[in-house]
Regions:
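Enzymes that bind and transform nitrogen-containing heteroaromatic metabolites
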Residues: 1-178
């Protein structure tokens, strides 16, 4: 299992945590959200993220909270990570190579993609099969768009293939129409 979740009975908060991830990054979610995240995370064998997210999170304290090897797409390897290890692999040759490396690491399991720019690059390269969005009722007013400008927009989605109502969040899953 990529991440474990412990759920309380009823609708009270549950704790979603990773056995080897950073315990400071434990999140409290509803039982429904914890179950949704557990099911989704069980499918994953590796992650692909961009350098901006890697830097913003300070490398998640050394290990992604989902306890998966994380492939980081970057133009330049960080100075403090001269070698790849079980936690992070750095790819400087583009999104296709990063996803191929993540598929190799995932060993038959799904590859998760996180970060709007990386998701957009995957859309543009035709690499996404599903999209999972966590809809939270908050308008931020500014910031980085979730996906930016997709080259072959509009991208049509089938579904939803999953809908989970958590507390203050709706988890939605769609298949990418190819």
């Amino acid at each position: 299992m990529a991440a474990s979740s412990t759920c309380s009975s009823g609708t009270g908060p549950a704790t979603s945590r990773s056995p080897r991830g950073n315990p400071d990054l434990t999140v409290k979610v509803s039982a429904a959200s914890a179950e949704h995240l557990r099911r989704l995370n069980e499918r994953l064998g590796a992650l692909v993220v961009g350098r901006r997210l890697y830097d913003m999170t300070n490398a998640w304290g050394g290990r992604h909270p989902l306890d998966l090897t994380t492939v980081v797409v970057t133009h330049q390897r960080p100075d403090d990570r001269p070698e790849d290890d079980e936690n992070f692999v750095f790819v400087t040759t583009g999104i296709e190579d990063a996803v191929a490396k993540a598929r190799e690491i995932a060993d038959g399991k799904d590859v998760g993609v996180n970060g709007g720019e990386i998701a957009r690059q995957c859309f543009d390269a035709g690499l996404l099969d599903e999209v999972h969005v966590d809809l939270v009722p908050v308008f931020l007013g500014s910031g980085i768009p979730l996906l930016g400008m997709i080259e072959d927009a509009p991208v049509e989605l089938d579904g939803p293939i999953s809908v989970t109502q958590g507390k203050g969040v709706t988890h939605l899953g769609y298949r990418v129409r190819k």
